[in-house]
């Protein structure tokens, strides 16, 4: 899950 890092703000 690479997108999870970018999705979390």
From Swiss-Prot:
Keywords: Ribonucleoprotein, Ribosomal protein. The keyword Electron transport does not apply. It comes from the Bacteria. GO terms for cellular component: ribonucleoprotein complex; ribosome. Belongs to the universal ribosomal protein uS10 family. Involved in the binding of tRNA to the ribosomes. Part of the 30S ribosomal subunit. This is Small ribosomal subunit protein uS10.
């Amino acid at each position: 899950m690479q997108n999870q890092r970018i999705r979390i703000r």
